[in-house]
Design a protein with these regions (language model features):
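ABC ATPase nucleotide-binding domain signature region
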Residues: 31-33, 37, 43-102, 182-183
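Pre-signature/interface helix of ABC/ABC-like ATPase nucleotide-binding domains
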Residues: 5, 24, 124-128
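Pre-Walker A (P-loop) beta-loop-beta motif of ABC nucleotide-binding domains
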Residues: 14, 22-37, 70, 175-176
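Walker B catalytic motif
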Residues: 154-155, 160
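A short, flexible loop at the N-terminus of ABC-type nucleotide-binding domains that lies
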Residues: 1-21, 28-30, 56-60
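Helical segment within the ABC ATPase nucleotide-binding domain
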Residues: 164-175
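ABC-family P-loop ATPase nucleotide-binding domains
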Residues: 10-13, 69-141, 145
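Catalytic Walker B motif of ABC-type/P-loop ATPase nucleotide-binding domains
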Residues: 150-154, 167
Length: 183
């Protein structure tokens, strides 16, 4: 269970609030979406939940984030630019879940994401993947880490209609809680 109690997030620079007195509980099997306009702190909230060091340089917060022992699977809004020139296989090798996976687990993750398991071993540079392929690649690696909760930051950006339908199915059938943000 993830619980936020009376969470307020402010920019350090001008103390402008991004979120005020926000309380929220995500229980087993829950699916929740936070929708608002761009620039209103949705990504900051997910980063804060996942790893406060990702945002401590530009925001401060008060309140409680209760996440005892939870393993998060975090999908960032943008594919990390530092990986654009490396092959898919090299990107996969940076995931502990991938390195520890059995061939059966890899095949299962690939099937769940409608990928061929050979995709994980591709020499294709990550920067040449479509938006949908990047989302599926990252989600497949998250699945292999077996997180307790998925945190998805704008997962529907830069994907086609077919991949969007697949993403909706993935979220709705995922047995784990999912918190995602959109605009």
């Amino acid at each position: 269970m993830l619980q936020l109690k009376n969470l307020t997030i402010r920019h350090k620079k001008d103390l402008r609030p991004l979120l005020e007195d926000f309380s929220f509980t995500l229980n087993e099997g829950d699916k929740a979406v936070i929708i608002s306009e761009e620039g209103n702190g949705k990504s900051t909230l997910l980063k804060l939940i996942y790893d406060k060091t990702l945002v401590e340089g530009y925001v401060e917060y008060t309140g409680e984030i209760i996440k005892r022992g939870i393993i998060f699977g975090y999908l960032p809004q943008e594919f990390p630019p530092e990986y654009k020139d490396i092959p898919v296989y090299s990107f996969c090798c940076q995931s502990e879940g991938f390195l520890n996976a059995t061939p059966k687990q890899l095949a299962s993750a690939a099937s769940r994401l409608q990928l061929d398991s050979a995709f994980f071993y591709s020499e294709q540079p990550c920067g040449t993947l479509s938006g949908g392929e990047k989302v599926k690649l990252q989600l497949s690696l998250l699945c292999l880490t077996e997180p307790d909760i998925y945190l998805l930051d704008e997962p529907s950006n830069d994907i086609d209609i077919e991949t969007l339908q697949w993403l909706e199915d993935f979220i709705s059938t995922c047995p784990n809680p999912v918190l995602y943000v959109s605009h």
